[in-house]
């Protein structure tokens, strides 16, 4: 009996941790239309402006949102500077990053691995934009999902080139 009690004591912290992870709130929001860029960028700023943080971005072809919403993208860069929010951005080889005022660091991956639908990871959130007619924005709000995407980003960041 004592052996069983000891073995339960050993696994109890792991079970408690799993139970807490299962309780993490999860929500999925979808948007469509011409305002998805404004909604996406505003949500990033609103999430990180108080506590700070970093935005991890994959598959960003920055010319697309810039062409569609120049004013909104310029405001986003001003907000990054004002609220001291940093970005790490993965773009395709041959592209140049748009932001060069110290807010963003860029790395590049070969074009054959590039997917034109951007993913942004920030706080406990993950965004995906699907370009089309209309454009779509999907926001997943969950710490575990965000952490999972963060790990994938770090793997890709480590493999991407600085030049």
Regions found by a protein language model. Name each.
Residues 1-27:
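Short, charged amphipathic alpha-helical surface segments
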Residues 9, 20-23, 52-53, 88, ...:
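Residue-level signal for secondary-structure boundary elements
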Residues 16-19, 48, 80, 157:
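Short, well-ordered alpha-helical segments in soluble proteins
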Residues 26-30, 62-63:
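Surface-exposed cleft-lining segments at the edges of enzyme active sites
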Residues 33:
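Intrinsically disordered, low-complexity polar regions and short flexible loop motifs
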Residues 36-141, 145:
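Hydrophobic protein-protein interaction segments
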Residues 136-163:
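Signature of lipid phosphatidyltransferase scaffolds
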